[in-house]
């Protein structure tokens, strides 16, 4: 059974985008290709247990086993050696991606403190959107009492859109709560 947001995309979003941008074929309509969730734990160089808890939390949030990310080069000021584990990442595709985005938009984002909308300036010029989250406890899968340290995370929404305008329209039609243009 397809995810709720995936069905909504096919039945509602695609026709609206075809009408708005005058696409001749359904294959020209931008689509969400993947979502990448990354947690950087710089302190893992001194305390490896922090990386383990971050990986466990990321696994709970996404439902997928995280991949360990290692330092590309040594930086002595940060007491960091090349090849040292300093973060974790998950790449979500297809059904799991739509389910995560649905939970992110409808459950997690409304739990952000003093939330007034996501910034619409975080597009990269190629139709991809990046958002930084300051606390992992906005996700209901995380038990606040068992969190030893508040971690932030970076979430990248990779789309097949050619321009930022197309990507903005796609994500806003999918329900992404952007700030109003006049604010």
Curated annotation (Swiss-Prot):
Disulfide bonds: none annotated. Keywords: Ribonucleoprotein, Ribosomal protein, RNA-binding, rRNA-binding, tRNA-binding. GO terms for biological process: translation. Signal peptide: none annotated. It comes from the Bacteria. GO terms for cellular component: ribonucleoprotein complex; ribosome. Gene3D superfamilies: 3.30.1440.10. Belongs to the universal ribosomal protein uL5 family. PANTHER family: 60S RIBOSOMAL PROTEIN L11-RELATED. This is one of the proteins that bind and probably mediate the attachment of the 5S RNA into the large ribosomal subunit, where it forms part of the central protuberance. In the 70S ribosome it contacts protein S13 of the 30S subunit (bridge B1b), connecting the 2 subunits; this bridge is implicated in subunit movement. Contacts the P site tRNA; the 5S rRNA and some of its associated proteins might help stabilize positioning of ribosome-bound tRNAs. This is Large ribosomal subunit protein uL5. It comes from Chlorobaculum tepidum (strain ATCC 49652 / DSM 12025 / NBRC 103806 / TLS) (Chlorobium tepidum). The gene is rplE.
């Amino acid at each position: 059974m397809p995810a709720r947001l995936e069905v909504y995309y096919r039945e509602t979003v695609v026709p609206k985008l075809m009408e708005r941008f005058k696409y001749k074929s359904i294959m020209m309509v931008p689509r969400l290709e993947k979502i990448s969730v990354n947690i950087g734990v710089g302190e893992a160089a001194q305390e490896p247990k922090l990386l383990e808890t971050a990986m466990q939390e990321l696994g709970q949030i996404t439902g997928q086993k995280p991949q360990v990310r290692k330092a590309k080069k040594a930086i002595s000021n940060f007491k960091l050696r090349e090849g040292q584990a300093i973060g974790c990442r998950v790449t979500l595709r297809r059904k799991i991606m739509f389910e995560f985005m649905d939970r992110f938009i409808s459950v997690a984002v409304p739990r952000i403190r003093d939330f007034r909308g996501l910034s619409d300036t975080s597009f990269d010029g190629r139709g991809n959107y990046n958002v930084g989250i300051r606390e992992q406890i906005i996700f209901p899968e995380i038990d606040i009492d068992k969190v030893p340290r508040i971690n932030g995370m970076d979430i990248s929404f990779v789309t097949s859109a050619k321009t930022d305008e197309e990507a903005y329209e796609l994500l806003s039609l999918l329900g992404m709560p952007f700030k109003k243009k006049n604010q």
